[in-house]
Amino acid sequence: MTTELEIDDRKEEEAQIPGETSESEEGDEPVKMNRVKRACAMAAESLKEAKRIKNMLMEEECVLQLGNCKKTASYGHRLSKTEACCPSCFSVAFRGKDYENEFTIWKQKAMDGQTHVRSEQFVKRYVNSCFLPYYAKCHQCSKYSKLITSDSLSAQQLSDFKCDCASTIESPKIERVREDSEWCFNEFGHPPLLQNNISYDLLVDHYVTRTTGMDATCQEKAALIDNGGIEFRDTRRIMNMFYVPFTDVIANIVHPEFMETDEKFAFPKFADDPISIYYLQVRNTIIAMWLKHPFVELTVKMIEPQIIVRGHARIFFIEHLIHPILEFLTIKGVVNYGAFDFRIDPLNGMRPKIAIIGAGISGISTARHLKHLGIDAVLFEAKDRFGGRMMDDQSLGVSVGKGAQIIVGNINNPITLLCEQIGIKYRNSNFFCPLIDENGRCFTLERKELDDQVDLHYNNVLDAIRNKYQSDRNFPDVPLEVTNFRHFTEMFSKMSSGLLSAADLDSLYTPEFEKLLDFHLGNLEFSCGTHVSNLSAKDYDHNEKFGNFAGEHAVITDGAQRIIDFLATGLDIRLNCPVKCIDWGRDDRKVKIFFENAEQAAEEFDKVVITTSLSVLKSNHSKMFVPPLPIEKQKAIDDLGAGLIEKIAVKFDRRFWDTVDADGLRTEYFGKVSDCKTDRSLFNIFYDFSGKDPNGEDTFVLMSYVTAEHVNLVNVLTESEVADKFCATLRKMFPSAVINPLGHMMSHWGADRFVGMSYTFVPFGSDGDATYNQLKKSIDEKLYFAGEHTIAAEPQTMAGAYISGLREAGQIVMSLKRDSATFE
């Protein structure tokens, strides 16, 4: 085996003959001389480095002390920046009679899919894994002690370790590692691989362990040890934060083998291979701990015992990486978010004044995350209640959301996690949605083939439209009108094998086919809060290009307002404070807020977060901001659509809508197939909100909605008249049922000047990504924007609004933390 010093000796010999040139250079003397100079410089530098390492090894003690140890590492092998071994120990470790068998067994486990290995590096990996001592940190005095053992240590053992504090003296090398933030930048040692790591069981089935920085030979003792007083429970059904190869990308995941762009920006020294493995090892450990127990705050003290590796590497991880990486992931809202107690410390002693306009979920999310990060904020809410569009009604005996109540995809969804943290009940929805026409006929059960054919055709056409715009960026945008749907079918018939040819369209588009197609278009209008003629064919579903939350949809049966009430605890929320003007152009870099109530004094702040709805911005931005917002921001506000739906719920004396499919799935919602095209946005889907009232009595409630051309129905008719239309529709769908309404409730978001909408949509002619991204941009590090209208990947949802609040809180902290938002 060739040692490093032998390689260096050859470099020294080569450096003594720098003037040699190849025949191809002889014809060009200047070029030849330049090359000679460069070669001389490189050789001299190489010689200098070789001598430095040689001298260093001559002075160092061998860390292994095996067999016939030479005591010093002269002519030996460097294992890390501060650890080396002599040639004798290095050879004994894998060739000696006492260790050869162990090496063979270790090698079989360690190959881990490898067919070829670099022998010296592979042996270094073996030495790192089995021979280097552990360094345990005393939980009382924080001094490090060397522990020599052939057995691997567990997180519990490292957590419990206590030294004889008075007599323990750390070696100079330990001090050196403590002080050297670039200790890992060493080209000779093998990167340490984590043992008994908590992320192992999450990654082993999908990745080669060494590429994620784990030791495949030593993972039997991985375990969480600190539950923070809350019982451990399985969260895999709601969380999966590591990307699984060859599967669809979902929201809120990371790739365990690669750093994200913002991670590279924050930790530029670790941005490139192979050094990035050090960052990834700590990051993956932290995320795995959060994934397995997201019910208490992750702290440095909890993470330290989970970083298990032999040698000085463990000191480096603990002293230089855990804290900044945990801080970064916390600020970004990747971990340590939600509804539980945090240990709050002021950020670097700073006390900036932060105002948040609007106390809906995005505003409350911003304020709560800031508070977790050590910064207080004041929320100004125009209404006499907080919560925004998360508002429940209990008048019918069960919780019915006037606004948001549906979790759209429950895997990695922060709303699902909030429910779990708080203890709020939610019910996963099945996908059985029977379609019933106004003659009482259930297409899903009686005409299943036609129902499936229409569903396939509808989705194929939309897929063809999406594919066309993806393949041809210059293809002009058009409105996604119902009158164009048949045109789209003809236009894209050749793009999808699932579409019929134009010659078959007349036989395809029967009256029943078109009625079922209208149901799907009506459902699309509900999803966007507007008529399909207003939607961009190019970008109506622009968020589908991002990873969405996976899993089933769910209904928050306890009501979404409980989430808001919990998150708002301890925050400074000032109700009945409508804002009149925000002066952000002052020379002193302060932002001054004026209120509609003339008796309320104006207040100055360092930073202001605007979380009002898009509808409010559309109506007021021209007079609300002084000076006016940048033209690009104004255009984005004008370009994005403010969708609107209104909800109606009615209580009945019995559950008359029981329907089951062939698999016995009970109906949780059902669709109405209208005879008239214009009625498809009138009570398109009915949701079952039945449950127990506070007295434990069965309560039967259906909820539906109006949108598009029918959305103003709740304002032009009385609530009783709207409820009568609701029941009249149900009587047509269930002609033999006895339908006795006992009460009703409905929303009036469109008439609320402090809300004015439900959720956003991308109108014809707008660019979805550009518009959402412009809306989220901060201005001059003084004005910040949050809300579902500012998040391109998850608009229209509680989760999107909540995440936008975490995002802006993180942006504020990053701007305050230091001029350069790096964590090294």
Swiss-Prot record:
Cofactor: FAD
Single GO MF annotation: FAD-dependent H3K4me/H3K4me3 demethylase activity
Its EC number(s): 1.14.99.66
Reactions this protein catalyses: N(6),N(6)-dimethyl-L-lysyl(4)-[histone H3] + 2 A + 2 H2O = L-lysyl(4)-[histone H3] + 2 formaldehyde + 2 AH2
Keywords, ordered alphabetically: DNA damage, FAD, Flavoprotein, Nucleus, Oxidoreductase, Transcription, Transcription regulation
GO cellular component: nucleus
Expression sites (tissue/organ): In hermaphrodites, expressed in gut cells, embryonic cells and sheath cells. Not expressed in sperm or pharyngeal neurons.
Region of interest (Disordered), residue spans: 1-31
SWIRM domain mapped to chain residues: 245-346
SUPFAM superfamilies: FAD-linked reductases, C-terminal domain (SSF54373), FAD/NAD(P)-binding domain (SSF51905), Homeodomain-like (SSF46689)
Localization terms from the record: Nucleus
Phenotypic consequence of gene deletion: Embryonic lethality in 2.7% of embryos and 17% reduction in brood size compared to wild type. No larval arrest or high incidence of male phenotypes. Disrupted mitotic progression characterized by a reduction in the length of the premeiotic tip which is where mitotically dividing nuclei are located in the germline, and furthermore the nuclei in this region are disorganized. Increases methylation of 'Lys-4' of histone H3 in embryos, in premeiotic tip nuclei and pachytene nuclei. Increases the expression of spr-5 in mitotic cells. Reduces expression of mlh-1.
Residues that hold FAD according to the record: 352-407, 579, 788, 796-798
Primary localisation category: nucleus
Database matches in PROSITE patterns: SWIRM (PS50934)
GO BP terms: DNA damage response
Its job: Histone demethylase that demethylates di-methylated 'Lys-4' of histone H3, a specific tag for epigenetic transcriptional activation, thereby acting as a corepressor. Acts by oxidizing the substrate by FAD to generate the corresponding imine that is subsequently hydrolyzed. Plays a role in the mitotic development of the germline. May be involved in H3 demethylation in mitotic cells including gut and embryonic cells. Plays a role in sensitivity upon interstrand cross-link DNA damage, probably by positively regulating the expression of mlh-1.
Family, as annotated: Belongs to the flavin monoamine oxidase family.
PANTHER family linked: FLAVIN MONOAMINE OXIDASE, LYSINE-SPECIFIC HISTONE DEMETHYLASE 2
Protein name per Swiss-Prot or TrEMBL: Lysine-specific histone demethylase 1B homolog
Source organism of the structure: Caenorhabditis elegans
